[in-house]
Amino acid sequence: MQKDDVAGRITAVAEQVLTPQGLELVEVEYKREGRQMVLRLFVDKPGGISLDDCAAVSRELSEILDVEDFIRENYTLEVSSPGLNRPLKKEADYERYAGRLVKVRTFELLADEEGNRRKTFLGDLVGLSDGVVTLTLREGQLARIPLDKIAKANLEFEF
């Protein structure tokens, strides 16, 4: 089974485990690290996820994966918090984290409202409207970034 197929099936199985517990699947990674395949799930919930939450999800998911047995290679299962620099993956993330500091990287050079072209934008997330993410940049100007131009977006933690 291809990596993308595994990630897709894992997403479906994980959602069945997480949703009843009030947990959210943020991201699934299935990749080779050294000689070993690693299946890594990042999960979250309002107020943050605990180590006990991760352990419970790992146990339950491991049992289901052992029964379904659709991953043919040996792998290590890891369940983790998305961390302080949580990725923004879903449209709802751009609404939920409005007002927070984010870093957005785009696939191509884009201009802010003053015409400065860049691929990395750092600013306070205003929100998402009609498929466009709006940030108030650290320099004060606005940047409007089409969602389909975003390569990666993360919350940024300020010390």
Swiss-Prot record:
SUPFAM superfamilies (alphabetical): YhbC-like, C-terminal domain, YhbC-like, N-terminal domain
Subcellular location, principal: cytoplasm
GO cellular component terms given for this protein: cytosol
Keyword Cytoplasm (UniProt): yes
PANTHER family in the record: RIBOSOME MATURATION FACTOR RIMP
Record function comment: Required for maturation of 30S ribosomal subunits.
Family that this chain belongs to: Belongs to the RimP family.
Protein name as annotated: Ribosome maturation factor RimP
